[in-house]
Amino acid sequence: MSSDAASPVVTRIAPSPTGTMHIGTARTGLFNWLFARKHGGKFVLRIEDTDRERSTPEATQAILDGMAWLGLDYDGEAVSQFARADRHREVAEQMLAEGHAYKCFSTQDEIAAFRDAAKADGRSTLFLSPWREASDHPDAPYVIRLKAPRDGTTVIRDRVQSDVTIQNATLDDMILLRSDGTPTYMHAVVVDDHDMGVTHVVRGDDHLNNAARQIQIYAAMGWAEPVWSHIPLIHGDDGKKLSKRHGATGVMEYAEMGIPAAAMRNYLTRLGWSHGDEELFTDEQARDWFDLDGIGKSPSRLDMKKLANVTGWHIARTDDADLVAQIEGYLALTGAPALSQAQHDGLTRAMYCLKDRAKSLPDLLDKGRFVLENRPFDYDEKSVTMLDPVSRSILRELTAQLQNARWTRDTLEGVLNAAADSHGLKFGKLAGPLRAALSGRSVSPSVFDMMLVIGRDETLARLDEAASLT
């Protein structure tokens, strides 16, 4: 299969539920989701839960939560790999019956002794089972091994890495079924991908060598291979393997940081894929533009500054009401108190003046404190300094002058500039005390925006309160 649209596209995400959803898994899922959605295909979810000791319901839920937050909707029901163990055994038994696999009775001690001797002799430690061609079998525990080719080469035709040729002499007779009858991951993946109709396998390049081994199962069963695309991993900003010291590694950590999901999708899509020089784009553009040929061969680097810039671009272009809804979701996720109706309405009115230069949802909350907090204000230290006796006197005058003023930006600018002029001040000198009076803080949105958002009555009440400080 060489064409993106040779058959109805089916892609998958197949995480192991052994912890949080890693950002690398999220990006892989996003690439698969974009490709399927672009081609009108299916995107399916398989939970690879064969490691029963490490797989937990909580970790499975973490995967579902991460996908839901990122907006990666999948088709059909989630599939449990563990629940398909009978099917995996069935295929292994078929391969055994058809001569593509064999029973191996070698013990762990015998395998270890083989490798020790090979190492001592300077030979390859690749285990060569003496049972590969045996027909006389003892009554003893055994595993079922793939009968891998010993001669020639296997070519992985990869859309990202190009053709990769593997010498078959380097392939092991990998185990398909353990002695207790449970399937191995390497075997189960192939059976599941085939049965689920997966046409394109897009996964990390740490699985590239696995592909050469898994191709043998496809060949033995007479199944068509999927289109392979092995994508480079994500590194830290220093070029080393991504770890906690580089920043958050779990996708829900970004949700808890208040990164909007749309911004995260944009950033992750661009992390290892490109469409010309485009850095900032919408979901619709990503779906239209995404293709496998745009994925680079080199590892991408996590860059938190670039993520902040992407986030700022998306916040500035998001509908005000939608941003308030996202803030409510963020507060619920982090366990913070929910917005009251008054706070909800105030944020909605104020959002137009909060979005400028905001890099996260918490930034919006911080800028919006003037509509979230009630009087009396707990003035910050700088605000108290700004509200000196002279400033408080000017605020008292302004309170009287604003009583009957038309509540428009032009009128307010005229009144405040006239007040500054009458005291021989530039408006910037008056803006500080006004910010302090209207928000209780030294940093806030513009004075005029705050006055328009909170209205005449609340503005006058705040000016009066600040003017009355002693």
Curated annotation (Swiss-Prot):
Subcellular location(s) of the protein: Cytoplasm
Major place of residence: cytoplasm
Record field: catalytic activity: tRNA(Glu) + L-glutamate + ATP = L-glutamyl-tRNA(Glu) + AMP + diphosphate
GO cellular component: cytosol
A molecular function GO annotation: zinc ion binding
Superkingdom as given in the UniProt entry: Bacteria
Motif ('HIGH' region) on chain: 15-25
Motif 'KMSKS' region, chain ranges: 241-245
ATP-binding recorded as keyword: yes
EC number: 6.1.1.17
InterPro entries named among the record's database cross-references: aa-tRNA-synth_I_cd-bd, aa-tRNA-synth_I_codon-bd_sub2, aa-tRNA-synth_I_CS, aa_tRNA-synth_I_cd-bd_sf, Glu-tRNA-ligase_bac/mito, Glu/Gln-tRNA-synth, Glu/Gln-tRNA-synth_Ib_cat-dom, GluQ/Sye
Pfam family, one: Anticodon_2
Protein keywords: Aminoacyl-tRNA synthetase, ATP-binding, Cytoplasm, Ligase, Nucleotide-binding, Protein biosynthesis
UniProt: ATP binding residues: K244
One GO BP annotation of this record: glutamyl-tRNA aminoacylation
Subunit relationships: Monomer.
NCBIfam families: gltX_bact
Family, as annotated: Belongs to the class-I aminoacyl-tRNA synthetase family. Glutamate--tRNA ligase type 1 subfamily.
Function: Catalyzes the attachment of glutamate to tRNA(Glu) in a two-step reaction: glutamate is first activated by ATP to form Glu-AMP and then transferred to the acceptor end of tRNA(Glu).
Protein name (record): Glutamate--tRNA ligase 1
Record lineage: Bacteria, Pseudomonadati, Pseudomonadota, Alphaproteobacteria, Rhodobacterales
